[in-house]
């Protein structure tokens, strides 16, 4: 039981010291402070889909639909 309390006390002391000193979580890769560090985005935000694309004026409004299988006539077998 004494060993358990000793381990808990050491863990609590380590957590308090790492919270006070900052630890490696508050450092940036370039060595600057958090306010001066560069912000890197992993995912690029997408633009609006209604903007101009490969065709002038955005999407093609009247696109011919694909015919269904029933429109192709009888099956050959």
UniProtKB/Swiss-Prot annotation:
Where is the protein found, in the record's own terms? Secreted; Secreted, Extracellular space
Q: Which UniProt keywords apply?
A: Angiogenesis, Cleavage on pair of basic residues, Developmental protein, Gastrulation, Hormone, Pyrrolidone carboxylic acid, Secreted, Signal
Q: Which segments carry the region annotation Disordered?
A: 43-77
Q: What are the recorded GO MF terms, alphabetically?
A: apelin receptor binding; hormone activity
GO cellular component terms, semicolon-separated: extracellular region; extracellular space
Q: According to its UniProt record, where is this protein mainly located?
A: secreted
Instruction: Tell me the residues on which Pyrrolidone carboxylic acid occurs.
Output: 65
Tell me what PTMs the record reports for this protein. Answer: At least 5 active peptides may be produced by proteolytic processing of the peptide precursor.
Show the Pfam families listed in the entry. Apelin
Site annotation (Important for the balance between G(i) and beta-arrestin pathways induced by apelin-13-APLNR system) points to 75, 77
Instruction: State which residues form the propeptide.
Output: 23-41
Q: Biological process (GO) annotations?
A: angiogenesis; apelin receptor signaling pathway; coronary vasculature development; drinking behavior; gastrulation; negative regulation of blood pressure; negative regulation of fibroblast growth factor receptor signaling pathway; negative regulation of gene expression
- What parts of the sequence cross the membrane? none
Q: Which InterPro entries match?
A: Apelin
Compositional bias, Basic residues, is annotated for 58-71
Q: Say yes or no: keyword Hydrolase present.
A: no
Instruction: Kindly indicate where the leader peptide sits in this chain.
Output: 1-22
Please explain the role this protein plays, according to its UniProt record.
Answer: Peptide hormone that functions as endogenous ligand for the G-protein-coupled apelin receptor (APLNR/APJ), that plays a role in cadiovascular homeostasis. Functions as a balanced agonist activating both G(i) protein pathway and beta-arrestin pathway of APLNR. Downstream G proteins activation, apelin can inhibit cAMP production and activate key intracellular effectors such as ERKs. On the other hand, APLNR activation induces beta-arrestin recruitment to the membrane leading to desensitization and internalization of the receptor.
Q: Which family does it belong to?
A: Belongs to the apelin family.
Protein name, please? Answer: Apelin
Give the species.
Answer: Bos taurus
Q: What is the lineage of its organism?
A: Eukaryota, Metazoa, Chordata, Craniata, Vertebrata
């Amino acid at each position: 039981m004494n060993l358990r309390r000793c381990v808990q006390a050491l863990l609590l002391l380590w957590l308090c010291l790492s919270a006070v000193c900052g630890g490696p979580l508050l450092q940036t890769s370039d060595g600057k402070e958090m306010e001066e560090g560069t912000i890197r985005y992993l995912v690029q935000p997408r633009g609006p889909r209604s903007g101009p694309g490969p065709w002038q004026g955005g999407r093609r409004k009247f696109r011919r639909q694909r015919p269904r299988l029933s429109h192709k006539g009888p099956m050959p077998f």
